[in-house]
């Protein structure tokens, strides 16, 4: 009784576990369920009495009705799900039952078949045993008769052999004849002492000698195909002809065919077509010849195979030398840089086709020599691209010079230099990128020779980076420096605006372009070479030095242009007998106009730069030498016998305490410094010219007017107005020193004349 109850309890727990598994209740929730209250409907320890008691105490009638309705709904839902689960399991059970019934039927059929097979095997075993016992008596006799039959067939073959050989030769089946003779040769040689066999051997030797003569004639026929040659050599070798003689004749015949391919390659054509013809003709026939040669002679016993291989290696090296010379000569003729992919494809195809003969005959070095040719072609192409970049840069400079010399439309004079610089820089940079893209084809992954050590290392670092990019940047700097030569030395003068533009170009290269180009190159050509390369800082220093040299030359040139006007204006005038000044001389106005034009021109390419603080009214500033009272007090003493001190000494003492002005010092890369350098050169020339002339009263006054006019306009261009003030002060002072009658003009009159001018 207890056992029945335990079974029913186990069945309930099992069904309860299945339901929990169906509703997604895991084992992890058991621990939590143990702690639930007895009033939890879903709990394991649910107590209906406690639940109803609690529900009646805590809920109203309407709530009880709602709970009842909800519970009825849940019961119906659970009942529906339970029915669905039962139906699904029932269907699966029915399907499993059908499957088991079908398997039982199949196994029963297989058992019947196995029984039949076992009975058949037993019958076969019985028959085999009876046959073996029956034949056991006559087995030795049958074996003996079979041996006799085989011997008779061989003897019949030997007696019929001469007739068979003649028949095969008449039908042209030379290979069959050689095969028959090869089978019987050892037997005839073994039994040649017997008269019957000796006669057969003599007849066969005579027949095969005639066949050998026929094969030699065919072998020496130039019209024979490679397949016919191979067949002839193979048959002659089977006829025991000397192998070394056949090697020489075989190679001599092949030499003529390969030489004809080399003569066909002399005709010019497209580089890709040239390589295709060479590979399809010479290389293909060389491979076919080598393969046929090795299949014929490499199986010879003793040292014959080594001798044959050595002859083949020497033969291919001689002919391949001529082929490689033709290829290299044709590559030298490839000067067009328009489509580099054509050359790379040709080199790739050339390199790929050399792999076959290299594997067939490793000793001839096809692969090594082909790689050397590809490397030299790549190096030559880099040199061509470097030269093309140089020529492109020269062409750009020629275009810039023509643009600078051409007249400009009104209103567009100011934007010329900036546009030219941008166009020049962009054109050169784009050309460099184009060249890098073309050269990068040599290292493409689909190119066979790109995995060679040279193209992974030295080509990237020493070839492209150093030999192309660094060399071109150096060439740009050298070309720019050539414009710093003395104007007219080569018969043509360099436009000063070109010097200014090139200086800015080199400065831009120093600040950003060089780093960008080298970074782009290093990213595209990730070489594995560890050889030293030119650092970026060295190229930047070279570019900055070139920019400084060009800018110094520009300042010197513009300063000399203005100085030339001032020098002529001083040297061509009679300063002693000149009339009283009424206007500013035209040359001074021209000087101011030219310097203003240079200021505008420089401002298009360079930044303003730093200036020292100006005085409140620099244009109205009066220098000590401009003051008539100072001039009278300063220089009248030189004409008075009781002068307590020489005025020259006073002037020299004053110069000791003035700041030294370096006229030809290097300028900085800004507009103020450039204009300051030009004005220093101009005013210093003006000063030196004044020191060499003699002035009258009105000549001194004209110098005063001119210097005041220059002061009105030039102070705004320089970094320190005191520099202009000091130089002009010295000009007026020198004119006063050289004046025969130093009577300076009143400052107010000077200002009126300058304002009116």
Curated annotation (Swiss-Prot):
GO-annotated cellular components: cytosol; EARP complex; GARP complex; membrane; recycling endosome
Subcellular location: Golgi apparatus, trans-Golgi network; Recycling endosome
InterPro entries assigned to the protein according to its UniProt record, in alphabetical order: Cullin_repeat-like_dom_sf, EXOC2/Sec5_N_dom, Vps51
Domain of life: Eukaryota
This protein's UniProt keywords: Coiled coil, Endosome, Golgi apparatus, Lipid transport, Protein transport, Transport
Ranges in a coiled coil: 94-124, 371-392
SUPFAM superfamilies in UniProt: Cullin repeat-like
Assembly and interaction partners: Component of the Golgi-associated retrograde protein (GARP) complex Component of the endosome-associated retrograde protein (EARP) complex.
Family: Belongs to the VPS51 family.
Protein name: Vacuolar protein sorting-associated protein 51 homolog
Organism: Xenopus laevis (African clawed frog)
